[in-house]
Amino acid sequence: MLKCAWQNGPRQSNRWLWQLSNQIWKRSYSSKIRNIGILAHIDAGKTTTTERMLFYAGKTRALGEVHRGNTVTDYLTQERERGITICSSAVTFPWNDHRINLLDTPGHIDFTMEVEQSLYAVDGVVVVLDGTAGVEAQTVTVWSQADKHKLPRLIFVNKMDRPDADFVKCVSDLKDKLETQPVCLQYPVKNEDGQLAINDVIHLERLSWQQKDLGRSYKNVKLEPSDDLRQLQEKRNELIDQLSGLDDELADVVISTESFDKVDNALIERALRRATTQQKVVPVLLGSAYKNVGIQRLMDAVNSYLPAPEERNQIYDCFGTEVAGKVFKIVHDKQRGPLTLVRILRGEIKRGMRLISARGQAEVVSKLYEPLADEYREVSAVQSGDVVICAGLKSTVTGDLLTSSEEDDEFDESHELFAIDPQIPDAVYFCSIEPPSVSSQTAMEQALKQLQREDPSLRVSYDSVTGQTVLGGMGELHMDIIKSRILSEYKIDVDLGPLQIAYKEAIESPALTTLSVEKEIAGSKQSVSITLEVVKNQAELFSLDKSPENLPNLNTLRPRILQVLRKGSISALERGPRVGGQVVETQIRLHNATIGRGTADSFVMATASQCVQKLLSTSGTRLLEPIMALQIVAPSERISGIMADLSRRRALINDVLPKGERNKMILVNAPLAELSGYSSALRTISSGTASMTMQPCGFSSMNSVDESLAERRAQGLE
């Protein structure tokens, strides 16, 4: 190839060599990038861990503390007031000749959608465990999300300085509750002064951090022959044995080596990297972020064991030299307007570039920024594999795929292939929202529109019956944060109505009816006659009755008309007849339809919707209420009082398990309607000694008494 290039002349040869060197540089640059997310249960120490990473990487000059409200990644007023992460935030920092793009994600169940979108942008994750609690409810949730995205993982067992921390139990939880294969690279030990130190399994050394310089430096000392060294050598041998069963290259060396002691450390680390990126094992490290122990070695492990961008996302190779980028978050900046966070999957994004969303909308990138939470450094171009903030994108929404390709036929394919539309969980609560005055209505609608671009789990709808704007959200905290953000960011003091439970409805029995409607609109005759049936079915929402007597009629309907009938019919399922809940477990079956010439699609759609509403009233519906799964940890002497209170709340006790020496954990399912203010009640019953986590776990039928009570609540009579 080089010979051919020279034959075509020196100018072409120089261009070819420049292109080759440019490709090599880009590949080398990409290999040094690590895009990672930090996942955990609430209060496990994600944000503190992130703040330490920024400090030791030289990005910040002082340690950010959650309890002081001076963290970089928790920059929203609501986050600093409450001491929790609400929105995912992106930060970029250098570490040992690598560039780490890190996303700090929320731990609260109300903000699970934030985590889901962030995982589209990363190549690996660090899961932080609370060393005193092990695997908790939200840990299981975020782990399953990482499973869905097939992401390699590291475990960081935090808070190991605490006297009640239990490293062995945490590792056991990983095996039992997450069904994964952990490999321990470190073990905790106490120094002579009682401070937490770490024994390194691979290098057979002890790591001790210096608190005088806030943990910036640490000593690594080779262990002298002792019981500690013998135990650590056994752990190293177990690690080699475990990895050799998963990695052929290491297995060949082990077979030809006299002793495990002679297996080279670098060989072990390469085998561990291969096993981790292939998701065969999960390396486990430990430390204490608050006490400044173990963070540098965690960052080393991110560089060593988690994959580079080029090792994943090969599916996007089909874009060739075109740009492909995934929008994983949108934030609103007072000075710069909407800012779009994009993970660049292929190509290079430059300032002023024209991009097309997979929805077919053209956008122009006015400016590019490198992310550091709510601070930004302007750049001119960003390479494949990196994360960038784009300014000037006006119609792009979270979850969009951006590309420089303008081929129309590629839009539909990318929608199918790359799952553009995010899977938004059902709302758990809803409430009305009112502006402080009529003049503020437009400003409120604009604020809600912007918040929806940022947060797809926020539902905004208009109730034609009451004439109110209705919000749907993932929980009480979610709704409270939305109100607070509208006030602090948009200066609108909105009023939220009382929170209502998001009940669902299901039909009691099948029903069949025919609806014929004729009307003259603007001199044009509109006529529709339609026969529909509703039946119990959890599979398809809409189907055709292809029986011999109906098939000839259905064959005369054009595909566009069938689509209009389908859309109108399904829209009626959004509001059931009893409490306005979504109708589920129901299928609409079209038997036949006759559409008059010149009848507008909107008239056909409205008739189909009216027909379904008539059917729902005829068949009757039953209510389904949301059920929550709770994990309650409390001292053993408080358990009886807590369980007595739960029984009054229609709760189902699934299990009571020991949790340490003094505590027990109650696993329980309870209706959401019975849990209003439960966290306060639990504090009272347990005298502040109990803790609780809660997450949705489906819907359940109700008896007639509870249904009547739910209807009265929905009507504002309770």
Curated annotation (Swiss-Prot):
Keywords: GTP-binding, Mitochondrion, Nucleotide-binding, Protein biosynthesis, Transit peptide. Residues 31-310 form the tr-type G domain. It is found in: Mitochondrion. Its main location: mitochondrion. This is Ribosome-releasing factor 2, mitochondrial. GO terms for cellular component: mitochondrion. Residues 1-29 form a transit peptide. One of its GO terms (molecular function) is GTP binding. Gene3D superfamilies: 3.30.230.10, 3.30.70.240, Elongation Factor G (Translational Gtpase), domain 3 (3.30.70.870), P-loop containing nucleotide triphosphate hydrolases (3.40.50.300), Translation factors (2.40.30.10). It comes from Drosophila erecta (Fruit fly).
